[in-house]
Amino acid sequence: ARVISIAGEDSTASTISPYATVSESPGYIRAYFTTQVDNSVATIEQAQALGTNTNDTIAAYITSAQNTLDIAAYNINNSAIEQAINTAIANGVQVRYIAEGQNANLGFSAIDDSMPIHFRTDGMGSGMHNKFIVGDRDDAQNAFVLTGSTNFTTGNLNTDPNNVIILGDQSLARAYTLEFEEMWGSTGMEPDPANAKFGASKSINTPRRFLIGGSPVELYFSPTDGTTSAIL
């Protein structure tokens, strides 16, 4: 969409920008931490530390998907998450996976080899450092985005201080799908490496502002969206 201002015979127009409407989703926002947190400084509600149960929480969301799962993850070697992906595939869920090709990704040896995987490799833009899952993007009541700082590795989940953020919102899920499919190179089940874009090669094509459960949420993808400036 764009804004156009007209005064007499003169007019000016803004650049074309993507926008998202408010969805009919539940609108929950849940944040979890892999290590203990100091709740003495909480101002609204106490943060929740899942500890070694973080992988089970991620696995539960994966297996809750009914139709589609798009996963973009820097690295994976956690058995609970691997098994959850296998369960989703066995349940008929369409699963697509983007991985950083320079990592070990040892977990793939335990995942159903029918799952299509697109590896970001040298010559395909900068490294793929995402950690997100989009579930059931076309179902307003079940759509979710799971993201955060943690890789899907046992070390990141059980030892390192990390976080997991889960949002139940279809508009956000569709925005993440735009980002996923730009790296995937297609809208189908098979990736198109010739059309895939990573890093600075990506377009600025995702909405930035959302209203989720009555709370304003902003979305930025590095390096194209001016993420550092938005944080500052």
Report residues per predicted region:
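Internal, well-ordered alpha/beta segment that forms a basic, Gly-enriched binding/recognition surface
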Residues: F132
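Beta-strand-rich modules
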Residues: A1-G8
